[in-house]
Structure formats: C-alpha cells, structure tokens
Amino acid sequence: MSSHSESSIATVITALQDTEAFRAQVTAHQHRQLAGNTPPWQGTGLKLEAGQHYSVFASGRIQWSRRHPDLHGGPRFHLWARVAPGGAIVNLRQDTDSFIADHSGELELGIYMGMWQNDRGDLASDLAAYARLEGALEVSLLIWRGTASGGLAALLAAGADHAALSAELKHLEHPQTPPPGWSYLVEAGQAEIYRQAETDKDQPCIHLTGADEQGIIVREVDFPLTPDTRISWRWQVDQHPSEVPEDTPYTHDYVSVAAEFEDGRDLTWIWSSSLPPGHHFACPIKAWSARETHFVVRSGANEFGQWVAESRPVYADVAAAIGPPPARIVRIWLIVVATFQHGSFDASVAEITLHDGAQRLQVL
C-alpha cells in the first residue's frame, strides 16, 4: 500500500475499510466532526458490549476567545467519551487513545469545557461557557473485534500506513500509569505527566514533565487540621511552564502541591515564576474559583535545578487565604498546568509529609 502519511486518518480508514484485514479486525467505524460550541453529549449510534475495545483518533482545535487567539485546546484538552447509559467518562491522554467499554451501550462523545459534577459526565458548570467556543474536532472511531493493540498491529502488518495508527500501538505497548497510590483527578482528566522516579540520593520522588498539558494526581489521606498541622515537602523545578504572573485566566500555568479539605475546597502552594511569596488568590478560572485558592511559597528562577525544602503551617495558610479552616485534610494533590501558554515543564517532588507534633503521615 502506498504511503498515507500526508493523508488524514479518516482518509486512510476509508481506503482500508474494504480490505480483508480491516474487516477481520474492525466491527464498526465512524468519522464525525464535533463543534466546539456544542455541550456534551453527542450520540454516535455505535453500540458496544462491556469489555469491547475501541480506539479514538482526533485532530483540530477549539478556540476559547477571539480576543486572545493563543487560548485554545486540542483533543487532549477537550475530547471525552463514555458508553451510555451508565458508563464512566474517559478522556484522551494523547491525540489518539484506546479504551475498554465498562458498560454495554452507545458510545457517546463530548467536548468538555468547565467542571464535571461526577464521573458519569454530568456538568456542574454553566453551559453558557460553550457559547463563546469556536472551531471543531475531527474524530475517527474504530470498534475492534479483539484487542485494540492486536487490531492495530494486524492493520499495520497488512500495510496500513499512518502515523496515528503506529503512534497508538506504541502508546498501548508502553503505557504510563500514575505512581502507586496516586490517581488522576476526574475533573482534570487522565494524562501521562507523572511517573515514579528517584532523587540523586536514591530517594523516591515523583517526576512530572510535558508540554501543553495539564494534570492533577491525588492521594487519599485522613489527617486532622489543627493550628499545629504542617505540610512539608522537597521539590526541584528545572523548567517552569510560565514566565509571567500566573494569577490571570490567560497565564494560569503553574506547578504546585495542594491539600484538599473535607469541605471540598483545596489550597495549592505554588512555585511562581514572578509573584511574591505570601501572595494568595482565588483560582482565576471561573469553574474553579469557588473551589481552589493558590498561595505563593516560592518565586523566580534563581533556585531552578536544585532541591528546595518547604514547610507550611496549613491551618494558618488556610485561615489567611480562604477563611475558617475545616477539620480534616482528605487528599494531597500534585498539580501542573501548561495549557494556557502552551509551554513546557520539568519538575520533581519528594518527601511530602503531614505532621502536627502528635502524629506524622508520610504521603510520599
């Protein structure tokens, strides 16, 4: 087969659909366009059985603002799927991804902009946010008879030639999962940012690296929040995703350690590119502003490339930045965002500890 490397994945799939190899591997396929200004969910008419594999290939851009042309996102930011009724939502970790249906039902697709209410795909945020979105995503779907990896390998062996097919097979053969004990926060989606690593002293740490991505991993804890409660950690930032203040909705790219409290709110301690230590602000993103507050604990690039220790009085920081502190800490978060200015980041975090004099909890 001649090379289709310059063709769209939809064109390649259309060319393959009548081949014996394609019919042997694929039960159904579809190409569709999702307009950015259409809230979720959109039915595809494709039926899946629980346990069936499917792959999603997407391209395109959703523009968030005419006044700010640099504000936009692609499939990794916006495209989600679910099997309805009853299935959990999933998102693309790359511009291609593959999934296993957790329920039997219809495959649905959705453009995400705002805040999920739950992991079934109900939106908590206002649908009005969609009215200003422009652009669209082009989506191709393959429903497999067997495994996604087996189907992709068979198509490639039969002569199918497209970078997206090869990339997705490689993606499946080399999965990147979050560090043990940590999971991605549903509202921010799955990613491939964080991995278990070691410091130069052979101590366990979490390394985060990427470009034009975002992700939050969380670890469940149960720790009292008293005037004596402190959170300590060490971190090293080698590349920061922002070079300007992060407290605007156009430049909100940052690295942070955070604590979530029993009331659902969270306080994130950030290493800012340029805001002064002690500065705190509500998240400038509307869907997050009532939930999340940022507190600058370190600033500037002078200490990039070296391990730096932090220790924060959680109760006092909450009282200063949010208000009356709740009674308990329920999760610790690691956060990185680089989707506003589309920059790169490289950092590591180690030795996260909660302690209050009476007890000590080693989180990492």
Where are these regions (language model features)?
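Secreted extracellular polysaccharide-interacting domains
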Residues: 40, 205-227, 240-242, 292-296
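Extracellular ligand-binding interfaces
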Residues: 80-81, 238-306, 345-348
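Extracellular polysaccharide-targeting segments
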Residues: 144-161, 265-285, 304, 338-364
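Extracellular beta-strand ligand-recognition surfaces/modules
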Residues: 109, 119-126, 249-257, 291-300, ...
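Solvent-exposed strand-to-loop "edge" motifs in beta-rich extracellular domains
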Residues: 59-61, 112-114, 234-240, 262, ...
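Short carbohydrate-recognition loop motifs
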Residues: 26-31, 84-85, 191-217
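Acidic, Ser/Thr/Pro
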Residues: 1-169, 177-178, 250-252, 273-284
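Extracellular/lumenal carbohydrate-interaction signature centered on repeated Trp-anchored short motifs
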Residues: 46-49, 220-231, 301-304
